[in-house]
């Protein structure tokens, strides 16, 4: 399971012209599920996201986590983060999970995150979405449950 994590001042997502999720200070996550992912991968990613220290303390050091600052999360399903563009000019998505498995693990991840974080908003799985992000920093971190990076 993989996530592009962006620290934001605010973020929102629109589907079919309607706003379906909005957060203030916190993290926007673009989440992809791999073929071989399990609930353990989702658990790992959930713990990492909730406790990742990428918020600044009073000395401007990254010492505070999402939970420390009472931040919010916008989770966007995005199979393209599983893309492999090392060869050729078109990304290969052969490592991305099939729809049913991806949706099940994505929903599992969101529910686990809701147990830790005060506010979690989501896009719509497999929908075309317009995601607006006001980056804070910018601070962007890549996470992978297989620890590829």
From Swiss-Prot:
Molecular function, one GO term: Ser(Gly)-tRNA(Ala) hydrolase activity
Keyword Glycoprotein: no
Subcellular localization: Cytoplasm
Transmembrane segments: none
Pfam families, sorted: Tyr_Deacylase
Family listed: Belongs to the DTD family.
UniProt function note: An aminoacyl-tRNA editing enzyme that deacylates mischarged D-aminoacyl-tRNAs. Also deacylates mischarged glycyl-tRNA(Ala), protecting cells against glycine mischarging by AlaRS. Acts via tRNA-based rather than protein-based catalysis; rejects L-amino acids rather than detecting D-amino acids in the active site. By recycling D-aminoacyl-tRNA to D-amino acids and free tRNA molecules, this enzyme counteracts the toxicity associated with the formation of D-aminoacyl-tRNA entities in vivo and helps enforce protein L-homochirality.
Protein name (record): D-aminoacyl-tRNA deacylase
Native species: Caldicellulosiruptor bescii (strain ATCC BAA-1888 / DSM 6725 / KCTC 15123 / Z-1320) (Anaerocellum thermophilum)
Organism taxonomic ancestry: Bacteria, Bacillati, Bacillota, Bacillota incertae sedis, Caldicellulosiruptorales
Gene: dtd
């Amino acid at each position: 399971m993989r996530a592009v994590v962006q620290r934001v001042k605010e973020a929102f997502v629109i589907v079919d012209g309607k706003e379906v999720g909005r957060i203030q200070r916190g993290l926007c996550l673009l989440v992809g599920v791999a073929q071989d992912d399990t609930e353990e991968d989702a658990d790992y990613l959930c713990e990492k996201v909730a406790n990742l220290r990428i918020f600044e303390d009073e000395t401007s050091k990254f010492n505070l986590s999402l939970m420390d600052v009472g931040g919010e999360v916008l989770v966007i399903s995005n199979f393209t983060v599983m893309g492999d563009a090392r060869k050729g000019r078109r990304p290969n998505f052969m490592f991305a999970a099939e729809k049913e498995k991806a949706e099940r693990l994505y929903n599992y991840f969101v529910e686990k995150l809701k147990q830790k974080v005060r506010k979690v908003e989501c896009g719509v799985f497999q929908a075309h979405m317009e995601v607006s992000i006001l980056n804070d920093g910018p601070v962007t971190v890549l996470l992978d449950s297989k620890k590829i990076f």
